[in-house]
From Swiss-Prot:
It comes from Oryza sativa subsp. japonica (Rice). One of its GO terms (cellular component) is cytoplasm. GO terms for molecular function: microtubule binding. This is Microtubule-associated protein 70-2. The keyword Cytoplasm applies.
Length: 599
Protein backbone atom coordinates (compact mmCIF):
# COMPACT_ATOMS: atom_id res chain seq x y z
CA UNK A 1 0.00 0.00 0.00
CA UNK A 2 2.81 2.37 0.85
CA UNK A 3 4.50 1.58 -2.45
CA UNK A 4 1.24 2.23 -4.33
CA UNK A 5 0.79 5.60 -2.58
CA UNK A 6 4.38 6.58 -3.36
CA UNK A 7 3.90 5.59 -7.02
CA UNK A 8 0.72 7.69 -7.23
CA UNK A 9 2.45 10.71 -5.66
CA UNK A 10 5.43 10.27 -8.02
CA UNK A 11 3.16 10.08 -11.08
CA UNK A 12 1.23 13.16 -9.91
CA UNK A 13 4.46 15.11 -9.34
CA UNK A 14 5.75 13.99 -12.78
CA UNK A 15 2.53 15.20 -14.38
CA UNK A 16 2.79 18.54 -12.57
CA UNK A 17 6.44 18.90 -13.64
CA UNK A 18 5.57 18.12 -17.26
CA UNK A 19 2.70 20.63 -17.09
CA UNK A 20 5.08 23.29 -15.70
CA UNK A 21 7.60 22.53 -18.42
CA UNK A 22 4.92 22.79 -21.06
CA UNK A 23 3.77 26.03 -19.49
CA UNK A 24 7.33 27.38 -19.58
CA UNK A 25 7.89 26.27 -23.16
CA UNK A 26 4.49 27.38 -24.46
CA UNK A 27 5.05 31.20 -24.50
CA UNK A 28 8.38 30.84 -26.31
CA UNK A 29 6.93 28.64 -29.05
CA UNK A 30 3.57 30.41 -29.34
CA UNK A 31 4.19 31.60 -32.89
CA UNK A 32 5.27 28.12 -33.95
CA UNK A 33 2.12 26.60 -32.40
CA UNK A 34 -0.07 29.15 -34.17
CA UNK A 35 1.74 28.46 -37.43
CA UNK A 36 1.25 24.69 -36.93
CA UNK A 37 -2.45 25.15 -36.16
CA UNK A 38 -2.79 27.37 -39.23
CA UNK A 39 -1.02 24.80 -41.39
CA UNK A 40 -2.73 21.57 -40.40
CA UNK A 41 -5.18 22.43 -37.62
CA UNK A 42 -3.80 20.29 -34.79
CA UNK A 43 -0.47 19.60 -33.11
CA UNK A 44 0.44 15.87 -33.03
CA UNK A 45 2.71 16.47 -30.05
CA UNK A 46 -0.15 17.94 -28.02
CA UNK A 47 -2.47 15.16 -29.12
CA UNK A 48 0.08 12.54 -28.04
CA UNK A 49 0.66 14.26 -24.68
CA UNK A 50 -3.08 14.47 -24.05
CA UNK A 51 -3.46 10.80 -24.91
CA UNK A 52 -0.66 9.81 -22.55
CA UNK A 53 -2.13 11.97 -19.76
CA UNK A 54 -5.51 10.32 -20.28
CA UNK A 55 -3.87 6.89 -20.04
CA UNK A 56 -2.14 7.90 -16.79
CA UNK A 57 -5.46 9.12 -15.40
CA UNK A 58 -7.13 5.86 -16.38
CA UNK A 59 -4.36 3.90 -14.67
CA UNK A 60 -4.77 6.04 -11.53
CA UNK A 61 -8.51 5.33 -11.56
CA UNK A 62 -7.84 1.61 -11.97
CA UNK A 63 -5.42 1.78 -9.03
CA UNK A 64 -8.06 3.46 -6.87
CA UNK A 65 -10.61 0.82 -7.84
CA UNK A 66 -8.07 -1.92 -7.06
CA UNK A 67 -7.36 -0.41 -3.62
CA UNK A 68 -11.10 -0.22 -2.90
CA UNK A 69 -11.47 -3.86 -3.96
CA UNK A 70 -8.55 -4.79 -1.68
CA UNK A 71 -10.23 -3.09 1.29
CA UNK A 72 -13.54 -4.81 0.55
CA UNK A 73 -11.80 -8.16 0.18
CA UNK A 74 -10.01 -7.67 3.48
CA UNK A 75 -13.28 -6.90 5.25
CA UNK A 76 -14.96 -9.91 3.66
CA UNK A 77 -11.95 -12.04 4.59
CA UNK A 78 -12.21 -10.99 8.22
CA UNK A 79 -15.92 -11.84 8.25
CA UNK A 80 -15.13 -15.19 6.66
CA UNK A 81 -12.47 -15.89 9.27
CA UNK A 82 -14.99 -15.18 12.03
CA UNK A 83 -17.51 -17.47 10.33
CA UNK A 84 -14.83 -20.16 9.98
CA UNK A 85 -14.00 -19.89 13.68
CA UNK A 86 -17.68 -20.25 14.60
CA UNK A 87 -18.02 -23.21 12.26
CA UNK A 88 -14.94 -24.87 13.76
CA UNK A 89 -16.43 -24.46 17.28
CA UNK A 90 -19.74 -25.97 16.11
CA UNK A 91 -17.82 -28.72 14.38
CA UNK A 92 -15.96 -29.61 17.59
CA UNK A 93 -19.25 -29.71 19.51
CA UNK A 94 -20.77 -31.98 16.89
CA UNK A 95 -17.70 -34.22 17.04
CA UNK A 96 -18.18 -34.60 20.80
CA UNK A 97 -21.87 -35.37 20.32
CA UNK A 98 -20.96 -37.95 17.68
CA UNK A 99 -18.53 -39.65 20.03
CA UNK A 100 -21.19 -39.82 22.77
CA UNK A 101 -23.78 -41.22 20.38
CA UNK A 102 -21.29 -43.80 19.11
CA UNK A 103 -20.57 -44.97 22.67
CA UNK A 104 -24.31 -45.18 23.36
CA UNK A 105 -24.79 -47.15 20.17
CA UNK A 106 -22.10 -49.61 21.17
CA UNK A 107 -23.73 -50.15 24.59
CA UNK A 108 -27.14 -50.60 22.97
CA UNK A 109 -25.67 -53.04 20.49
CA UNK A 110 -24.28 -55.09 23.37
CA UNK A 111 -27.67 -55.07 25.06
CA UNK A 112 -29.29 -56.15 21.81
CA UNK A 113 -26.84 -59.02 21.52
CA UNK A 114 -27.66 -60.10 25.07
CA UNK A 115 -31.41 -59.98 24.42
CA UNK A 116 -30.94 -61.95 21.22
CA UNK A 117 -28.98 -64.59 23.11
CA UNK A 118 -31.71 -64.77 25.77
CA UNK A 119 -34.33 -65.01 23.03
CA UNK A 120 -32.45 -67.87 21.45
CA UNK A 121 -32.23 -69.63 24.84
CA UNK A 122 -35.97 -69.13 25.41
CA UNK A 123 -36.71 -70.53 21.98
CA UNK A 124 -34.52 -73.52 22.74
CA UNK A 125 -36.36 -74.05 26.04
CA UNK A 126 -39.67 -73.77 24.20
CA UNK A 127 -38.54 -76.36 21.68
CA UNK A 128 -37.42 -78.63 24.54
CA UNK A 129 -40.77 -78.21 26.26
CA UNK A 130 -42.59 -79.09 23.09
CA UNK A 131 -40.41 -82.18 22.73
CA UNK A 132 -41.23 -83.16 26.26
CA UNK A 133 -44.91 -82.66 25.52
CA UNK A 134 -44.66 -84.91 22.56
CA UNK A 135 -42.95 -87.48 24.67
CA UNK A 136 -45.65 -87.12 27.25
CA UNK A 137 -48.35 -87.56 24.67
CA UNK A 138 -46.49 -90.53 23.29
CA UNK A 139 -46.09 -92.00 26.75
CA UNK A 140 -49.75 -91.53 27.77
CA UNK A 141 -50.39 -94.91 26.42
CA UNK A 142 -48.30 -96.38 29.12
CA UNK A 143 -50.31 -97.01 32.26
CA UNK A 144 -47.38 -96.81 34.54
CA UNK A 145 -46.77 -93.13 33.78
CA UNK A 146 -47.97 -90.37 36.15
CA UNK A 147 -50.78 -88.07 35.07
CA UNK A 148 -50.12 -85.51 32.40
CA UNK A 149 -51.49 -82.59 34.38
CA UNK A 150 -48.93 -83.14 37.05
CA UNK A 151 -46.22 -83.03 34.43
CA UNK A 152 -47.70 -80.08 32.45
CA UNK A 153 -48.37 -77.74 35.34
CA UNK A 154 -44.75 -76.86 36.09
CA UNK A 155 -44.01 -76.70 32.39
CA UNK A 156 -46.88 -74.27 31.77
CA UNK A 157 -45.67 -72.10 34.61
CA UNK A 158 -42.23 -72.03 33.10
CA UNK A 159 -43.79 -71.19 29.74
CA UNK A 160 -45.71 -68.27 31.20
CA UNK A 161 -42.58 -66.92 32.79
CA UNK A 162 -40.69 -67.33 29.54
CA UNK A 163 -43.49 -65.56 27.60
CA UNK A 164 -43.49 -62.67 30.06
CA UNK A 165 -39.72 -62.34 29.71
CA UNK A 166 -40.09 -62.48 25.91
CA UNK A 167 -42.69 -59.69 26.00
CA UNK A 168 -40.43 -57.59 28.18
CA UNK A 169 -37.53 -58.23 25.83
CA UNK A 170 -39.68 -57.28 22.82
CA UNK A 171 -40.64 -54.02 24.52
CA UNK A 172 -36.97 -53.36 25.20
CA UNK A 173 -36.16 -54.12 21.56
CA UNK A 174 -38.83 -51.67 20.36
CA UNK A 175 -37.47 -48.96 22.65
CA UNK A 176 -33.94 -49.66 21.44
CA UNK A 177 -35.12 -49.48 17.82
CA UNK A 178 -36.68 -46.09 18.50
CA UNK A 179 -33.47 -44.89 20.12
CA UNK A 180 -31.37 -46.16 17.22
CA UNK A 181 -33.64 -44.39 14.71
CA UNK A 182 -33.34 -41.16 16.68
CA UNK A 183 -29.57 -41.55 16.85
CA UNK A 184 -29.39 -42.27 13.12
CA UNK A 185 -31.42 -39.11 12.39
CA UNK A 186 -29.09 -37.12 14.65
CA UNK A 187 -26.12 -38.67 12.87
CA UNK A 188 -27.54 -37.70 9.47
CA UNK A 189 -28.07 -34.13 10.65
CA UNK A 190 -24.53 -34.06 12.02
CA UNK A 191 -23.19 -35.35 8.70
CA UNK A 192 -25.12 -32.64 6.85
CA UNK A 193 -23.74 -29.93 9.12
CA UNK A 194 -20.24 -31.36 8.69
CA UNK A 195 -20.67 -31.31 4.90
CA UNK A 196 -21.88 -27.70 5.03
CA UNK A 197 -18.92 -26.76 7.23
CA UNK A 198 -16.51 -28.47 4.85
CA UNK A 199 -18.08 -26.69 1.87
CA UNK A 200 -17.76 -23.37 3.68
CA UNK A 201 -14.15 -24.16 4.53
CA UNK A 202 -13.45 -24.98 0.86
CA UNK A 203 -15.10 -21.70 -0.16
CA UNK A 204 -12.93 -19.86 2.37
CA UNK A 205 -9.84 -21.54 0.91
CA UNK A 206 -10.93 -20.55 -2.61
CA UNK A 207 -11.52 -16.97 -1.51
CA UNK A 208 -8.11 -16.87 0.14
CA UNK A 209 -6.49 -18.15 -3.05
CA UNK A 210 -8.42 -15.60 -5.12
CA UNK A 211 -7.38 -12.87 -2.70
CA UNK A 212 -3.75 -13.88 -3.12
CA UNK A 213 -4.14 -13.87 -6.91
CA UNK A 214 -5.74 -10.43 -6.76
CA UNK A 215 -2.87 -9.17 -4.62
CA UNK A 216 -0.41 -10.50 -7.18
CA UNK A 217 -2.39 -8.88 -10.02
CA UNK A 218 -2.43 -5.57 -8.11
CA UNK A 219 1.34 -5.75 -7.71
CA UNK A 220 1.69 -6.50 -11.42
CA UNK A 221 -0.60 -3.56 -12.25
CA UNK A 222 1.45 -1.28 -10.01
CA UNK A 223 4.65 -2.38 -11.76
CA UNK A 224 2.99 -1.83 -15.15
CA UNK A 225 1.86 1.61 -14.00
CA UNK A 226 5.42 2.46 -12.99
CA UNK A 227 6.70 1.22 -16.36
CA UNK A 228 4.05 3.29 -18.15
CA UNK A 229 5.03 6.34 -16.12
CA UNK A 230 8.65 5.84 -17.15
CA UNK A 231 7.64 5.39 -20.78
CA UNK A 232 5.45 8.48 -20.52
CA UNK A 233 8.35 10.53 -19.18
CA UNK A 234 10.64 9.20 -21.90
CA UNK A 235 8.10 9.99 -24.61
CA UNK A 236 7.56 13.48 -23.18
CA UNK A 237 11.34 14.05 -23.20
CA UNK A 238 11.59 12.74 -26.77
CA UNK A 239 8.69 14.94 -27.88
CA UNK A 240 10.31 17.98 -26.26
CA UNK A 241 13.60 17.17 -27.99
CA UNK A 242 11.84 16.75 -31.33
CA UNK A 243 9.92 20.00 -30.88
CA UNK A 244 13.19 21.76 -30.04
CA UNK A 245 14.87 20.30 -33.14
CA UNK A 246 11.87 21.34 -35.26
CA UNK A 247 12.15 24.88 -33.90
CA UNK A 248 15.88 24.92 -34.58
CA UNK A 249 15.25 23.71 -38.12
CA UNK A 250 12.58 26.37 -38.61
CA UNK A 251 15.05 28.98 -37.39
CA UNK A 252 17.66 27.52 -39.74
CA UNK A 253 15.18 27.68 -42.63
CA UNK A 254 14.40 31.29 -41.80
CA UNK A 255 18.12 32.03 -41.53
CA UNK A 256 18.62 30.31 -44.90
CA UNK A 257 15.88 32.49 -46.38
CA UNK A 258 17.56 35.57 -44.93
CA UNK A 259 20.90 34.39 -46.34
CA UNK A 260 19.29 33.86 -49.75
CA UNK A 261 17.82 37.36 -49.59
CA UNK A 262 21.24 38.73 -48.62
CA UNK A 263 22.82 36.83 -51.54
CA UNK A 264 20.27 38.33 -53.93
CA UNK A 265 20.95 41.79 -52.53
CA UNK A 266 24.68 41.22 -52.99
CA UNK A 267 24.04 40.02 -56.54
CA UNK A 268 22.15 43.21 -57.31
CA UNK A 269 24.86 45.31 -55.74
CA UNK A 270 27.49 43.43 -57.77
CA UNK A 271 25.47 44.01 -60.94
CA UNK A 272 25.20 47.71 -60.15
CA UNK A 273 28.92 47.91 -59.41
CA UNK A 274 29.67 46.05 -62.66
CA UNK A 275 27.52 48.53 -64.56
CA UNK A 276 29.30 51.42 -62.88
CA UNK A 277 32.61 49.76 -63.73
CA UNK A 278 31.58 49.39 -67.37
CA UNK A 279 30.60 53.03 -67.48
CA UNK A 280 33.90 54.08 -65.91
CA UNK A 281 35.90 51.89 -68.32
CA UNK A 282 34.04 53.38 -71.27
CA UNK A 283 34.66 56.90 -70.02
CA UNK A 284 38.34 56.05 -69.53
CA UNK A 285 38.59 54.69 -73.09
CA UNK A 286 36.87 57.81 -74.38
CA UNK A 287 39.29 59.99 -72.42
CA UNK A 288 42.27 58.07 -73.85
CA UNK A 289 41.00 58.50 -77.42
CA UNK A 290 40.43 62.21 -76.93
CA UNK A 291 43.87 62.55 -75.31
CA UNK A 292 45.51 60.81 -78.27
CA UNK A 293 43.66 63.08 -80.70
CA UNK A 294 44.63 66.18 -78.75
CA UNK A 295 48.24 65.03 -78.67
CA UNK A 296 48.23 64.44 -82.45
CA UNK A 297 46.65 67.84 -83.07
CA UNK A 298 49.15 69.58 -80.78
CA UNK A 299 52.05 67.76 -82.45
CA UNK A 300 50.86 68.73 -85.96
CA UNK A 301 50.05 72.38 -85.19
CA UNK A 302 53.58 73.74 -85.76
CA UNK A 303 54.07 71.69 -88.96
CA UNK A 304 53.08 72.55 -92.50
CA UNK A 305 50.21 70.94 -94.35
CA UNK A 306 52.56 68.68 -96.25
CA UNK A 307 54.42 67.57 -93.10
CA UNK A 308 51.32 66.69 -91.10
CA UNK A 309 51.81 62.95 -91.20
CA UNK A 310 50.67 60.36 -88.65
CA UNK A 311 53.35 58.06 -87.32
CA UNK A 312 53.41 54.60 -88.88
CA UNK A 313 53.04 52.82 -85.57
CA UNK A 314 49.99 54.83 -84.63
CA UNK A 315 48.53 54.37 -88.11
CA UNK A 316 48.99 50.61 -87.90
CA UNK A 317 47.39 50.52 -84.46
CA UNK A 318 44.43 52.58 -85.65
CA UNK A 319 44.10 50.41 -88.75
CA UNK A 320 44.16 47.25 -86.64
CA UNK A 321 41.64 48.80 -84.27
CA UNK A 322 39.34 49.78 -87.14
CA UNK A 323 39.60 46.32 -88.74
CA UNK A 324 38.72 44.74 -85.39
CA UNK A 325 35.78 47.11 -85.04
CA UNK A 326 34.62 46.20 -88.55
CA UNK A 327 34.82 42.50 -87.72
CA UNK A 328 32.94 43.14 -84.49
CA UNK A 329 30.30 45.04 -86.42
CA UNK A 330 29.91 42.13 -88.85
CA UNK A 331 29.56 39.70 -85.95
CA UNK A 332 27.09 42.03 -84.30
CA UNK A 333 25.07 42.24 -87.49
CA UNK A 334 24.81 38.44 -87.62
CA UNK A 335 23.92 38.31 -83.92
CA UNK A 336 21.41 41.12 -84.41
CA UNK A 337 19.73 39.21 -87.25
CA UNK A 338 19.50 36.11 -85.06
CA UNK A 339 18.19 38.09 -82.12
CA UNK A 340 15.70 39.84 -84.39
CA UNK A 341 14.36 36.48 -85.52
CA UNK A 342 14.20 35.09 -81.98
CA UNK A 343 12.65 38.32 -80.71
CA UNK A 344 10.07 38.23 -83.48
CA UNK A 345 9.15 34.71 -82.40
CA UNK A 346 9.09 35.80 -78.76
CA UNK A 347 6.96 38.79 -79.71
CA UNK A 348 4.44 36.52 -81.39
CA UNK A 349 4.40 34.23 -78.37
CA UNK A 350 3.96 37.13 -75.96
CA UNK A 351 1.21 38.61 -78.11
CA UNK A 352 -0.61 35.27 -77.97
CA UNK A 353 -0.10 35.14 -74.22
CA UNK A 354 -1.34 38.72 -73.85
CA UNK A 355 -4.44 37.80 -75.82
CA UNK A 356 -5.02 34.81 -73.57
CA UNK A 357 -4.52 36.96 -70.49
CA UNK A 358 -6.85 39.65 -71.80
CA UNK A 359 -9.48 37.01 -72.53
CA UNK A 360 -9.02 35.66 -69.02
CA UNK A 361 -9.32 39.16 -67.53
CA UNK A 362 -12.45 39.84 -69.54
CA UNK A 363 -13.99 36.69 -68.02
CA UNK A 364 -15.71 36.55 -64.58
CA UNK A 365 -14.50 39.59 -62.53
CA UNK A 366 -15.23 37.91 -59.19
CA UNK A 367 -12.33 36.80 -56.96
CA UNK A 368 -13.70 33.25 -56.84
CA UNK A 369 -12.39 32.44 -60.34
CA UNK A 370 -9.70 29.81 -60.60
CA UNK A 371 -6.20 31.30 -60.90
CA UNK A 372 -4.80 30.77 -64.44
CA UNK A 373 -1.17 30.07 -64.12
CA UNK A 374 0.38 30.24 -67.58
CA UNK A 375 2.83 27.86 -69.13
CA UNK A 376 5.54 30.41 -68.48
CA UNK A 377 5.50 29.29 -64.83
CA UNK A 378 7.85 26.38 -65.28
CA UNK A 379 10.86 25.32 -63.35
CA UNK A 380 11.07 28.46 -61.19
CA UNK A 381 12.68 28.35 -57.79
CA UNK A 382 9.48 27.69 -55.93
CA UNK A 383 10.26 25.57 -52.92
CA UNK A 384 7.97 23.31 -51.01
CA UNK A 385 8.11 23.86 -47.27
CA UNK A 386 6.71 20.73 -45.68
CA UNK A 387 6.28 21.18 -41.94
CA UNK A 388 4.05 18.61 -40.21
CA UNK A 389 2.72 17.19 -43.47
CA UNK A 390 1.42 20.48 -44.98
CA UNK A 391 2.62 21.70 -48.43
CA UNK A 392 2.88 25.45 -48.85
CA UNK A 393 3.96 26.72 -52.26
CA UNK A 394 5.77 30.02 -51.99
CA UNK A 395 7.20 32.34 -54.60
CA UNK A 396 10.30 34.43 -54.18
CA UNK A 397 9.47 38.06 -54.78
CA UNK A 398 12.03 40.46 -56.38
CA UNK A 399 13.03 41.88 -52.98
CA UNK A 400 14.01 38.37 -51.78
CA UNK A 401 11.28 37.86 -49.16
CA UNK A 402 9.13 34.72 -48.99
CA UNK A 403 5.57 35.62 -50.00
CA UNK A 404 2.39 33.60 -50.27
CA UNK A 405 0.73 32.83 -53.58
CA UNK A 406 -1.00 35.99 -54.77
CA UNK A 407 -4.56 35.96 -56.16
CA UNK A 408 -5.26 35.35 -59.79
CA UNK A 409 -5.87 39.00 -60.67
CA UNK A 410 -2.54 40.21 -59.27
CA UNK A 411 -0.60 37.43 -61.02
CA UNK A 412 -2.27 38.24 -64.34
CA UNK A 413 -1.64 41.97 -64.01
CA UNK A 414 2.04 41.42 -63.12
CA UNK A 415 2.47 39.06 -66.08
CA UNK A 416 0.80 41.48 -68.47
CA UNK A 417 2.84 44.50 -67.33
CA UNK A 418 6.16 42.62 -67.36
CA UNK A 419 5.49 41.08 -70.76
CA UNK A 420 4.45 44.48 -72.21
CA UNK A 421 7.71 46.01 -70.93
CA UNK A 422 9.68 43.18 -72.53
CA UNK A 423 7.90 43.65 -75.89
CA UNK A 424 8.33 47.42 -75.67
CA UNK A 425 12.09 47.19 -75.21
CA UNK A 426 12.67 44.16 -77.44
CA UNK A 427 14.16 46.20 -80.31
CA UNK A 428 16.46 48.17 -78.02
CA UNK A 429 18.23 45.07 -76.82
CA UNK A 430 19.44 44.18 -80.32
CA UNK A 431 21.68 47.26 -80.36
CA UNK A 432 23.86 46.12 -77.46
CA UNK A 433 27.22 44.40 -77.70
CA UNK A 434 25.96 41.19 -76.10
CA UNK A 435 22.37 41.60 -77.16
CA UNK A 436 21.97 38.10 -78.56
CA UNK A 437 23.08 36.40 -75.42
CA UNK A 438 20.98 38.69 -73.25
CA UNK A 439 17.91 38.11 -75.37
CA UNK A 440 18.44 34.37 -75.17
CA UNK A 441 18.97 34.61 -71.41
CA UNK A 442 15.82 36.67 -71.17
CA UNK A 443 13.93 33.99 -73.08
CA UNK A 444 15.21 31.39 -70.62
CA UNK A 445 14.18 33.57 -67.71
CA UNK A 446 10.69 33.95 -69.10
CA UNK A 447 10.52 30.17 -69.52
CA UNK A 448 11.66 29.55 -65.98
CA UNK A 449 9.01 31.52 -64.13
CA UNK A 450 7.02 34.75 -63.84
CA UNK A 451 8.91 35.92 -60.78
CA UNK A 452 12.04 36.57 -62.91
CA UNK A 453 10.38 39.06 -65.26
CA UNK A 454 11.49 41.98 -63.10
CA UNK A 455 15.09 40.97 -63.69
CA UNK A 456 14.48 40.93 -67.43
CA UNK A 457 13.05 44.46 -67.24
CA UNK A 458 16.15 45.54 -65.29
CA UNK A 459 18.28 44.04 -68.07
CA UNK A 460 16.27 46.00 -70.67
CA UNK A 461 16.86 49.20 -68.73
CA UNK A 462 20.57 48.43 -68.54
CA UNK A 463 20.63 47.90 -72.29
CA UNK A 464 18.89 51.22 -72.85
CA UNK A 465 21.43 53.07 -70.70
CA UNK A 466 24.32 51.37 -72.52
CA UNK A 467 22.74 52.23 -75.91
CA UNK A 468 22.42 55.89 -74.93
CA UNK A 469 26.06 55.99 -73.86
CA UNK A 470 27.13 54.27 -77.08
CA UNK A 471 25.32 56.84 -79.17
CA UNK A 472 27.13 59.64 -77.34
CA UNK A 473 30.44 57.86 -77.75
CA UNK A 474 30.03 57.43 -81.51
CA UNK A 475 29.26 61.12 -81.92
CA UNK A 476 32.49 62.03 -80.14
CA UNK A 477 34.60 59.58 -82.13
CA UNK A 478 33.49 60.68 -85.54
CA UNK A 479 34.81 57.54 -87.17
CA UNK A 480 33.18 55.31 -89.77
CA UNK A 481 31.53 53.30 -87.01
CA UNK A 482 29.06 56.16 -86.45
CA UNK A 483 26.60 54.55 -88.89
CA UNK A 484 25.83 51.69 -86.49
CA UNK A 485 24.63 52.52 -82.96
CA UNK A 486 25.54 49.12 -81.59
CA UNK A 487 29.30 49.69 -80.93
CA UNK A 488 30.67 48.90 -77.49
CA UNK A 489 34.04 49.89 -76.03
CA UNK A 490 34.06 47.37 -73.14
CA UNK A 491 37.24 45.30 -73.30
CA UNK A 492 37.08 41.53 -73.67
CA UNK A 493 39.10 40.91 -70.49
CA UNK A 494 36.61 42.91 -68.43
CA UNK A 495 33.72 41.11 -70.08
CA UNK A 496 35.34 37.73 -69.29
CA UNK A 497 35.86 38.81 -65.68
CA UNK A 498 32.24 39.84 -65.44
CA UNK A 499 31.13 36.56 -66.96
CA UNK A 500 33.25 34.66 -64.40
CA UNK A 501 31.72 36.68 -61.58
CA UNK A 502 28.24 35.98 -62.92
CA UNK A 503 29.04 32.26 -63.12
CA UNK A 504 30.40 32.25 -59.56
CA UNK A 505 27.31 34.09 -58.34
CA UNK A 506 25.09 31.59 -60.12
CA UNK A 507 27.01 28.75 -58.49
CA UNK A 508 26.60 30.41 -55.08
CA UNK A 509 22.87 30.78 -55.70
CA UNK A 510 22.68 27.15 -56.77
CA UNK A 511 24.54 26.07 -53.62
CA UNK A 512 22.19 28.14 -51.46
CA UNK A 513 19.16 26.62 -53.17
CA UNK A 514 20.68 23.17 -52.69
CA UNK A 515 21.27 23.85 -48.98
CA UNK A 516 17.67 25.05 -48.65
CA UNK A 517 16.47 21.90 -50.37
CA UNK A 518 18.62 19.80 -48.02
CA UNK A 519 17.10 21.60 -45.04
CA UNK A 520 13.62 20.98 -46.44
CA UNK A 521 14.51 17.30 -46.83
CA UNK A 522 15.77 17.25 -43.23
CA UNK A 523 12.50 18.81 -42.06
CA UNK A 524 10.56 16.19 -44.01
CA UNK A 525 12.68 13.44 -42.47
CA UNK A 526 12.00 14.84 -39.01
CA UNK A 527 8.29 14.95 -39.75
CA UNK A 528 8.48 11.34 -40.93
CA UNK A 529 10.34 10.42 -37.75
CA UNK A 530 7.62 12.10 -35.67
CA UNK A 531 5.00 10.12 -37.62
CA UNK A 532 6.93 6.88 -37.09
CA UNK A 533 7.28 7.64 -33.38
CA UNK A 534 3.55 8.25 -33.05
CA UNK A 535 2.86 5.02 -34.95
CA UNK A 536 5.31 3.12 -32.72
CA UNK A 537 3.63 4.54 -29.62
CA UNK A 538 0.23 3.46 -30.95
CA UNK A 539 1.61 -0.02 -31.71
CA UNK A 540 3.06 -0.26 -28.19
CA UNK A 541 -0.26 0.82 -26.70
CA UNK A 542 -2.05 -1.83 -28.78
CA UNK A 543 0.48 -4.44 -27.64
CA UNK A 544 -0.06 -3.45 -24.02
CA UNK A 545 -3.82 -3.74 -24.46
CA UNK A 546 -3.45 -7.13 -26.10
CA UNK A 547 -1.16 -8.33 -23.30
CA UNK A 548 -3.62 -7.10 -20.66
CA UNK A 549 -6.47 -8.88 -22.47
CA UNK A 550 -4.36 -12.06 -22.72
CA UNK A 551 -3.51 -11.82 -19.01
CA UNK A 552 -7.19 -11.40 -18.16
CA UNK A 553 -8.04 -14.42 -20.29
CA UNK A 554 -5.31 -16.47 -18.59
CA UNK A 555 -6.55 -15.40 -15.15
CA UNK A 556 -10.11 -16.35 -16.09
CA UNK A 557 -8.90 -19.72 -17.41
CA UNK A 558 -6.90 -20.30 -14.22
CA UNK A 559 -9.94 -19.47 -12.13
CA UNK A 560 -12.09 -21.88 -14.11
CA UNK A 561 -9.43 -24.61 -13.75
CA UNK A 562 -9.20 -24.03 -10.00
CA UNK A 563 -12.98 -24.06 -9.65
CA UNK A 564 -13.12 -27.36 -11.53
CA UNK A 565 -10.32 -28.80 -9.38
CA UNK A 566 -12.07 -27.69 -6.20
CA UNK A 567 -15.34 -29.21 -7.41
CA UNK A 568 -13.49 -32.43 -8.19
CA UNK A 569 -11.82 -32.43 -4.76
CA UNK A 570 -15.00 -31.77 -2.76
CA UNK A 571 -16.49 -35.34 -3.00
CA UNK A 572 -13.19 -36.82 -1.80
CA UNK A 573 -13.20 -34.74 1.40
CA UNK A 574 -16.12 -36.68 2.98
CA UNK A 575 -14.59 -40.16 3.36
CA UNK A 576 -14.39 -40.44 7.15
CA UNK A 577 -13.46 -38.87 10.45
CA UNK A 578 -9.78 -39.16 9.65
CA UNK A 579 -10.08 -36.75 6.71
CA UNK A 580 -12.24 -34.39 8.77
CA UNK A 581 -9.66 -34.33 11.52
CA UNK A 582 -6.98 -33.41 8.98
CA UNK A 583 -9.05 -30.59 7.40
CA UNK A 584 -8.41 -27.91 10.05
CA UNK A 585 -4.65 -28.27 9.61
CA UNK A 586 -5.01 -27.66 5.84
CA UNK A 587 -7.15 -24.63 6.47
CA UNK A 588 -4.78 -23.10 8.96
CA UNK A 589 -1.82 -23.22 6.53
CA UNK A 590 -3.16 -20.86 3.80
CA UNK A 591 -4.53 -18.52 6.46
CA UNK A 592 -1.03 -18.17 7.88
CA UNK A 593 0.36 -17.50 4.39
CA UNK A 594 -2.32 -14.85 3.80
CA UNK A 595 -1.46 -13.11 7.06
CA UNK A 596 2.19 -13.12 6.01
CA UNK A 597 1.25 -11.52 2.69
CA UNK A 598 -0.85 -8.90 4.43
CA UNK A 599 1.98 -8.08 6.80
Amino acid sequence: MADGGGGEEGSASALRGSARRRGAVQPAGLDADELLTLMHGSDPVKVELNRLENEVRDKDRELGDAHAEIKALRLSERAREKAVEELTAEYEKLDEKLKLTESLLESKNLELKKTNDEKKAAMAAQFAAEATLRRVHAAQKDDDMPPIEAILAPLEAELKLARQEIAKLQDDNRALDRLTKQKEAALLEAERTVEIALAKAAMVDDMQNKNQELMKQIEICQEENKILDRLHRQKVAEVEKLSQTVRELEEAVLAGGAAANAVRDYQRKVQEMNEERKILDRELARAKVTANRVAVVVANEWKDANDKVMPVKQWLEERRFLQGEMQQLRDKLAIAERTARSEAQLKEKYQLRLKVLEDGLRGPPSGSSRPTEGKSIGNGPSRRLSLGGADNMSKISPNGMLARRSPSFNSRSSLSTSSSLVIKHAKGTSRSFDGGTRSLDRGKVLGNGPHLLNRSTDAVRDCETTDDWKAANTEEKGSEATNSSSTDTVSGVLYDMLQKEVISLRKACHEKDQSLKDKDDAIEMLAKKVDTLTKAMEVEAKKMRREVAAMEKEVAAMRLDKDQENKAKRPGNFKGPGTTSQAPHGRNAPRGGLTRNLQ
